[in-house]
Swiss-Prot record:
Keywords: Acetylation, Coiled coil, GTP-binding, Isopeptide bond, Nucleotide-binding, Nucleus, Phosphoprotein, Ubl conjugation. It comes from Mus musculus (Mouse). Changing G256V: Mislocalized to the nucleoplasm. No effect on MDM2-binding. The modification N6-acetyllysine is found at K79. May be required to maintain the proliferative capacity of stem cells. Stabilizes MDM2 by preventing its ubiquitination, and hence proteasomal degradation. Residues 2-46 are annotated as: Basic. This is Guanine nucleotide-binding protein-like 3. The gene is Gnl3.
Length: 538
C-alpha cells in the first residue's frame, strides 16, 4: 500500500524559474492589452426608455412600475416561505423514539408506491420470453443462428423442441462467424450438423452503411475480403425454394443466444443497416419485422435467456448481462479453464502460468494495466479477456463429437421431416463454395476450446425466478461489506483454486494455531462478559 502524503509540497523555487514565470505573465498581459486596444472601447448602450412620441406612454410606464412591484412582492414572499420552512424543520427535531416511529410510518406509506412501481415495471427477461414466443408463432421458418466457434454450445434444446412441437414449422441452422475457425474444423461441424438439420455456412458483412449514407458513399467503398458476406446466396436460395413450394408469402424468424449475430445476418440479407448491431450483448429488446422482398419477411428477435443451471463457462459466454454483474474474475477464469494453455500463451504472449490469477497478473503487466501504486490491475485484465472471448475478433474453435447421438427432442424421423422441401444437394455445393472463399484465422489466433455441450434456455416466463426487493438490498449490502473487507481477498477467492501444495516448516505450521494461553483467555472472556482489568493484568 502506498504511504499517504503527510506534508504539502513546498512552494519554494529557484529565482530563475520565478522570474521566468513573471516574465511570461507580463508578456501575456501585454498581449491582452494590445488586443483590447485594437478592438476599441465600446460603451454599454443605455436603455433609452419610452420615447415621448410613443402613444400611451403613461400606460406603458405604469405597467412597467407594476411589474417591478410584483417582482419585489414575489421575492419577499419567497423569503417568508423559506423562513417558515426552516422554522418547521426546527420543530421536527424530536426525541429518538418519536423519530423511529416517524421512520416506520414513512416506510409503511412508501410500501404501496414500491408495489405500484414494481407492477408497472416488468422484468425484461419475461418480456424477452414473450417476444420469442411471438416470433416462433408468427414464423414459417425459424433460423437458429449459431456461433461457428462453439456451435453445440449455441444450440438451445428448449427452443428447438418448441419449434418441433409447433408442427408445420421448419428449422434451419446458420453457422455465423465462419471466418474465425479453421476450414477443416468448419467442414467437420457441417457434416455433423447436417445429419440433424439443414445447415448454412454464413459470414455476415461488416461493410454495410446506413440507409441515408449508403448511396452517397457507394463509389468510395473498397470491399475487402474480410468484409464481404459469404453464404448469402445459399440462404436466399433455400428460402426462395421453400416459398415457391409453399405457394404463399412466408415469414422467417431469427433466434439465438446473445452475440451470435442475429441482426447482422438480417442486415447482410437486406444489404442495409436495418437492425441495430453492436459489441454489447442484448441490444435487440423486441421483435422487428423486416421485409426482404415481396414474398419473404424476416423477423428479428431478442436474445434467448440462458438458464442459471448451466455450467459457469456457458453462463460467462452467453449471459446477456454486463461483466460487473457476472463478476469478471469468475467469468474469465471459467472461460480460461476450458481453453488450451499453450495456445493461450501463444495468443496473449505471456509466460506460462500456474492458474488464472497468475495469468491475469502477467497479462496486466504485459498490457500496462496498473492500479494506483503500480500493482497490476487483475480485474481489468479479466474484463479484457471476457470482452475478447464474447466479441467477434478472437478465433477459437471446438471439435465436434466423435459420433452423432440424437438428443431427447430429436430423432431420425424428425430430421427427415425438417429436411423435406429443401434441395440439400444444391445447399451442399453452395456451402462448399462458401468454405473455399472464406479466409480462416491466422495460426497464432487459433485457440482450442472444450465445449460444455448444449446450453439450456428459458422459454416460459414462469420459470424465471425473481428476487424480492428486500433480498436484493441484502445482497447488495453483503457485496459492499465483502468489498470493504479487502479487494485482494475477494479477487483470490473468485479465481479457480491453485492445484499446488507445498510442505510447511514446523514453525509455519504452528504459526496459524493459537497458543494455549490465548485460547484460555478467549474462553474466559466468552464466559464472563464483564471485563475486569484488575483480575487479568494484576
Amino acid at each position: 500500500m502506498k504511504r499517504p502524503k503527510l506534508k504539502k509540497a513546498s512552494k519554494r523555487m529557484t529565482c530563475h524559474k520565478r522570474y521566468k514565470i513573471q516574465k511570461k505573465v507580463r508578456e501575456h498581459h501585454r498581449k491582452l492589452r494590445k488586443e483590447a486596444k485594437k478592438r476599441g472601447h465600446k460603451k454599454p448602450r443605455k436603455d433609452p426608455g419610452v420615447p415621448n412620441s410613443a402613444p400611451f406612454k403613461e400606460a406603458l410606464l405604469r405597467e412597467a412600475e407594476l411589474r417591478k412591484q410584483q417582482l419585489e412582492e414575489l421575492k419577499q414572499q419567497q423569503k417568508l416561505d423559506r423562513q417558515k420552512e426552516q422554522e418547521r424543520k426546527r420543530k421536527l427535531e424530536v426525541s429518538p423514539g418519536d423519530e423511529q416511529s416517524n421512520v416506520e410510518t414513512r416506510e409503511e406509506s412508501d410500501e404501496p408506491k414500491r408495489k405500484k412501481a414494481k407492477a408497472g415495471k416488468q422484468n425484461p427477461k419475461k418480456l424477452h420470453c414473450q417476444e420469442l414466443k411471438k416470433v416462433i408463432e408468427a414464423s414459417d421458418i425459424v433460423l437458429e443462428v449459431l456461433d461457428a466457434r462453439d456451435p453445440l454450445g449455441c444450440r438451445c434444446p428448449q427452443i428447438e423442441e418448441a419449434v418441433i412441437q409447433s408442427g408445420s414449422k421448419k428449422l434451419i441452422l446458420v453457422l455465423n462467424k465462419s471466418d474465425l475457425v479453421p476450414k477443416e474444423n468448419l467442414e467437420n461441424w457441417l457434416n455433423y450438423l447436417n445429419k440433424e438439420l439443414p445447415t448454412v455456412v454464413f459470414k455476415a458483412s461488416t461493410n454495410l452503411k446506413n440507409r441515408k449514407t449508403f448511396k452517397i458513399k457507394k463509389k468510395k467503398v473498397v470491399p475487402f475480403q474480410s468484409k464481404i458476406c459469404c453464404g448469402k446466396e445459399a440462404l436466399w436460395k433455400l428460402l426462395g425454394d421453400f416459398q415457391q413450394s409453399c405457394g404463399k408469402d412466408i415469414q422467417v424468424g431469427v433466434i439465438g443466444f446473445p452475440n451470435v449475430g442475429k441482426s447482422s445476418v438480417i442486415n447482410s440479407l437486406k444489404q442495409e443497416w436495418i437492425c441495430n448491431v453492436g459489441i454489447s450483448m442484448g441490444l435487440t429488446r423486441s421483435m422487428q419485422i423486416v421485409p426482404l422482398d415481396k414474398q419473404i419477411t424476416i423477423i428479428d428477435s431478442p436474445c434467448l435467456i440462458i438458464s442459471p443451471c448451466n455450467s459457469p463457462t456457458a453462463l460467462a459466454l452467453r449471459s446477456p448481462a454486463s461483466i460487473e454483474e457476472l463478476r469478471p474474475l469468475e467469468a474469465a477464469s471459467a472461460i480460461l479453464s476450458q481453453a488450451d494453455n499453450e495456445q493461450v500463451v501463444l495468443k496473449y504472449t505471456v509466460p506460462e502460468y500456474k492458474d488464472s490469477l497468475h495469468f491475469f497478473t502477467k497479462l496486466a503487466q504485459r498490457r500496462g494495466l496498473h492500479q494506483k501504486g503500480g500493482s497490476p490491475n487483475v480485474e481489468s485484465a479479466a474484463k479484457l479477456v471476457w470482452s475478447e472471448w464474447t466479441g467477434a475478433s478472437l478465433g477459437y474453435y471446438c471439435h465436434p463429437p466423435a459420433s452423432w447421438n440424437h438428443s431427447l427432442h430429436f430423432n431420425e424421423n424428425i430430421a427427415a421431416v425438417m429436411k423435406k422441401g429443401f434441395n440439400l444437394e444444391e445447399l451442399e455445393k453452395n456451402n462448399a463454395h462458401s468454405i473455399q472463399v472464406l479466409k480462416g484465422p491466422h495460426l497464432t489466433n487459433r485457440i482450442l476450446f472444450r465445449s460444455s455441450g448444449l446450453t439450456n434456455g428459458i422459454l416460459d416466463e414462469k420459470d424465471i425466478v425473481e428476487e424480492s426487493p428486500r433480498q436484493t438490498e441484502d445482497k447488495q449490502d453483503a457485496d459492499d461489506q465483502e468489498n470493504g473487507s479487502g479487494e485482494r481477498n475477494a479477487e483470490i477467492s473468485d479465481v479457480a483454486p491453485v492445484e499446488e501444495t507445498r510442505e510447511l516448516s514446523p514453525e509455519q505450521s504452528t504459526a496459524g494455531k493459537p497458543s494455549d494461553g490465548s485460547s484460555a483467555l478467549d474462553r474466559a472472556s466468552q464466559e464472563d462478559e464483564t471485563y475486569d482489568f484488575t483480575t487479568d493484568y494484576i
